Design a protein with these regions (language model features):
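Blade/loop signatures of beta-propeller domains
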Residues: 23-55
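Beta-strand-rich domains and repeat architectures in extracellular enzymes and scaffolds
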Residues: 51-85
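Blade-loop segments of beta-propeller domains
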Residues: 57-62, 95-122, 129, 151
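Short coil/turn segments at the loop-to-beta-strand junctions that recur within blades
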Residues: 60, 101-108, 149-156, 212-216, ...
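Structural signature of eukaryotic scaffold interfaces centered on beta-propeller domains
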Residues: 68-71, 116-120, 158-164, 223-240, ...
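Asp-box/WD-like beta-propeller blade repeats and closely related beta-sheet repeat scaffolds
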Residues: 130-193, 208-216
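Beta-propeller blade signature
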Residues: 188-203, 251, 306-315
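Loop-centered beta-sheet repeat module
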Residues: 195-257
Length: 317
């Protein structure tokens, strides 16, 4: 039996709050009704995932860092030090493996690594910086090539390794264009979500997806009237079948697979444009027989960081 539940992650298990049989639209597509109350269901993390605890060994001063994990592969954990700009590689046992720092202004360097992806098979380290440029190095810092991005695009955080030959990303520059159009009272049509799949070797565009969206701003409007783009939206999530595309402006999650039609997976109701305070869908993760989603709320000019975030879960088998 399929079901939808709200869930709150806590320690190593989930509290599912509210659970009712899954509602289906007339076309059979599953949806979440955020106005409804669902019963509670508890799920332990160990029931849906293999849990491993790793302590990254920083006894060597060269591997001390202040930052976050950027990439996890079959055998490696990649961390970026936010102070020095160094990129550090640890084994899955937490032991230091290699490191490099190519921070600088030169043609073979990065200003600061905003996003790092690691392809362990080819030993390619993709480093995105503020210039919207992607440099490619080995895990020891040997320079390989620059990967041209489609003109005018800016992947930043919304980028994943799609397969052995390609990267998949959302052009976050569209959010800046929307703010500029609003500020200049422009009538430019910028209400769409652009996604690209590009070659890891030369940056060639292999596929382009353009999702239409509701013309509504999801970020914050300050007291001075300035628009601030929304933070924390996870628009691309890897899945076993391809990638899940979360498009909150249209309340829908799509499944993208290579050489196959785009498939809607689930949507939220009521629509983002009709809710007050505004609620929008964020993130969608497949894990085992379950699918997890978040719903954020914007009350007035404040983002829902200060408001309870609702977590939903459904059994989709």
């Amino acid at each position: 039996m399929k079901s939808i539940v709200e869930w709150f992650p806590m320690m190593i298990f989930f509290f599912a709050i509210s659970c009712l049989p899954e509602k289906q639209a007339k076309n059979g597509l599953a949806y979440i009704d955020v106005t409804k109350k669902y019963p509670e269901k508890e799920i332990f993390l160990t029931d849906i995932a293999e849990v491993t605890y790793v302590c990254l060994n920083s006894d060597d001063d060269d591997y001390l860092y202040k930052g976050r994990i950027h990439s996890i592969t079959e055998n490696m954990i990649v961390v970026c030090d936010e102070v020095s700009g160094s990129i550090l590689f640890f084994t899955k046992e937490g032991n230091p493996k290699s490191r490099f720092n190519r921070k600088g202004q030169g043609p073979d360097e990065y200003i600061f690594p905003l996003r790092v992806l690691f392809d362990e098979t080819t030993d390619d380290v993709f480093v995105m910086d503020q210039r919207g440029r992607t440099q490619v190095y080995s895990s020891t810092g040997m320079y390989k090539r620059v990967l041209p991005m489609p003109q005018g695009t800016m992947p930043l955080n919304a980028i994943v390794s799609f397969d052995e030959a390609s990267l998949f990303f959302y052009d976050e520059n569209i959010l800046i264009k929307r703010i500029a159009a609003d500020y200049n009272r422009s009538a430019d049509s910028i209400w769409f979500s652009p996604f690209y799949r590009i070659s890891k070797q030369d940056g060639a565009v292999l596929d382009y997806i353009e999702l239409q969206v509701t013309p509504i701003f999801l970020g914050i409007t300050t007291q001075d009237g300035f628009r601030v783009p929304p933070r924390g939206i996870t628009r691309i999530v890897k899945s076993k079948e391809g990638v899940l595309l979360c498009n909150p402006e249209s309340d829908t999650v799509f499944l993208y697979r290579k050489n196959q039609p785009l498939l809607p997976v689930i949507y939220k109701t009521p629509s983002v444009a009709s809710t007050d305070p505004m609620t929008y869908l964020n993130n969608c993760v497949d894990e085992g027989i379950y699918q997890f989603m978040e719903v954020y709320t914007v009350a007035g000019n404040e983002l829902s960081i200060r408001l309870p975030v609702k977590y939903y879960m459904r059994n989709h088998y």
